[in-house]
Swiss-Prot record:
Complexes and interactors: Dimer.
Record's signal peptide: 1-22
GO molecular function, one term: flavin adenine dinucleotide binding
Pathway(s) this gene product operates in, as recorded in its UniProt entry: Secondary metabolite biosynthesis
InterPro entries in the record: FAD-dep_OxRdtase, FAD/NAD-bd_sf, MTOX
Stimuli inducing this protein: Expression is down-regulated by ralstonins, lipopeptides produced by the plant pathogenic bacteria Ralstonia solanacearum. Expression is positively regulated by the imizoquins cluster-specific transcription regulator imqK.
EC id: 1.5.3.-
Glycosylation site positions: N97, N167
Protein source organism: Aspergillus flavus (strain ATCC 200026 / FGSC A1120 / IAM 13836 / NRRL 3357 / JCM 12722 / SRRC 167)
Protein name: Amino acid oxidase imqH
Protein family per UniProt: Belongs to the MSOX/MTOX family.
Length: 478
């Protein structure tokens, strides 16, 4: 189908900004008038420099970039994106290669999965990573004992590290050298600049509070004509019109649609430890990896470009995946965040003197994780790194998620409004790594054509199936 004559994109996050950039580079949209709307003024000093939005989920120092997905389509997309991260998208320090160690608790990595073991998720991820590395054990290799895990972390082997055999349940995992992390805040600012300097996108600052629904004119009307979304309503009462509205407002998307069950919207706590320059250099020297501990449901990234060691919890969807491989059905979260909650959908720093019990509990988990890593009173040669375990958190941040039940994105036309409203949301805590390729695929889905680009394993039909609008909300009207 031809590109619409006028397009509004609501939201300048991962989905919205990548779409705007891709449209600016796609000749199919050369005649389209494209407007990108966000409430945040990214260019307060003029168009030559962009400042990240501190309330956005992507305002962060680091995001893990890896391609070991069990689903072929995601794996294909992730590998394509990773190649771009290693080129211009990750230039100037925006992407850095760093190996990842994924660990869980259970029996030998070489044994079949056993019920109730968190190591099952790790075994599955290892199998995918090993195959995609061409079965090259120099790139992906097993850590089949607690001692091997500690050696891979570069932190020495604790005196109490288990020396048990393969039939004992202990900490095990694997290391993948084909991974890294990206500085998300800097990347989004860079992409804004590329998009602005294309001179193809109009930037509009404003808070969208609703979608404008229109009916066909009398000359075009017919029985049972479906309504159309013909633009947006801003908080100052003004309206902007377009043939196509792309709603990519992250955690705010369900609220704007009036579809609270479209995504599970909730927040988690992220904490940062400021490393000294000596600690940063020492961790780099020891080839300290990215760490994903599925037993603890915690992952760590660092040292980053600001010298932080970042600690975060699995999203609920990630936790559910781990439990699924252990044979445990955890179902949906028990409590949804009320949409009228103060600060709903807005990320930001937390006042550490006024933390809720839930946040305090999470920080205690992080502290325990750090004490395990940088322990004292054992044979490990840690030197001054032990101080990391007890240092106060330099920053505690609230981060919002928009999970789908399947963890698949929602990138599709809203079925109740024809081809006038397109939804791009449901990042489920894994969308950022696809940033270099996501906008291109969204454009293909808008045009309902792959323009000959997509291969047989990632056809437009497969993406339409994978990212379709969920049936339960398909007839929700604005």
């Amino acid at each position: 189908m031809p590109a619409p004559k006028s397009i509004i994109i609501v939201g300048s996050g991962v989905f919205g900004l990548s779409t705007a950039h891709a449209m600016s580079q796609n000749n199919e949209f050369a005649s389209s008038k494209i407007t990108l709307i966000d409430s945040w003024n990214f260019e307060p000093s003029g168009p030559s420099a962009s400042a990240p939005n501190p309330s956005a989920a992507n305002f962060d120092t680091s995001r893990i970039i890896r391609s070991d997905y069990s689903h072929r389509t995601y794996a294909t997309l992730a590998r394509e994106a990773q190649q771009k991260w290693k080129a211009d998208w990750g230039a100037d320090g925006r992407y850095r290669n760093q190996s990842i160690v994924m660990i869980g608790e259970g029996h030998s990595m070489k044994q079949p999965m056993k019920a109730l073991e968190s190591i099952n998720y790790v075994k599955h991820a290892y199998a995918q990573s090993y195959e995609r590395a061409g079965r090259n054990s120099d790139i992906v290799h097993i850590l089949d004992s607690e001692s091997a895990v500690w050696e891979a972390l570069g932190l020495g082997t604790p005196d109490e590290a288990s020396k048990a055999g393969p039939n004992a349940s202990e900490l095990r995992g694997y290391r993948n050298h084909n991974c890294g992390w990206a500085e998300s805040g800097a990347t989004m600012a860079w992409l804004r600049q590329k998009t602005i300097h294309s001179d193809r996108i109009d930037i509009h600052i404003g808070q969208v509070v609703g979608l404008r629904v229109c009916s066909d004119s009398p000359s075009e009307s017919h029985v049972n004509a479906e309504p159309r979304v013909c633009g947006v309503i801003l908080d100052d009462g003004s309206q902007l019109t377009a043939d196509l509205t792309v709603l990519a407002a992250g955690a705010m998307t369900p609220r704007l649609l009036g579809s609270p069950t479209l995504c599970d919207v909730y927040s988690e706590t992220v904490a940062y430890v400021q490393l000294t320059e000596m600690e940063r250099r020492e961790l780099v020297r020891r080839e300290f990896p990215l760490i994903v501990n599925v037993a603890r449901k915690i992952f760590a990234i660092g040292p980053d470009n600001q010298g932080f060691l970042k600690l975060a919890r699995f999203s609920w969807s990630g936790y559910r995946d781990v439990q699924k491989f252990a044979g445990v059905d955890v179902g949906p979260r028990s409590q949804a965040a009320p949409q009228e909650e103060d600060g709903y959908g807005a990320c930001g720093d937390l006042d550490q003197t006024k933390l809720s019990p839930d946040v305090e509990s999470t920080l205690q988990d992080y502290r325990g994780f750090l004490r395990e890593l940088f322990r004292s009173g054992d044979g490990g040669d840690l030197g001054g790194l032990r101080n990391i375990a007890t240092r106060p958190f330099a920053q505690v941040r609230r981060c919002w998620y928009a999970d789908t039940v399947s963890t698949d994105f929602i990138v599709d036309y809203h079925p109740a409004y024809g081809k006038s409203l397109f939804i791009a949301t449901g990042g489920s805590d894994h969308a950022f790594k696809f940033l270099p390729v996501l906008g291109e695929r969204i454009c293909e889905l808008i045009l309902q054509s792959d323009n000959g680009k997509a291969g047989p394993s990632e056809s437009i039909q497969e993406l339409q199936r994978l990212w379709k609008f969920p049936g339960g909300d398909s007839h929700a009207k604005l």
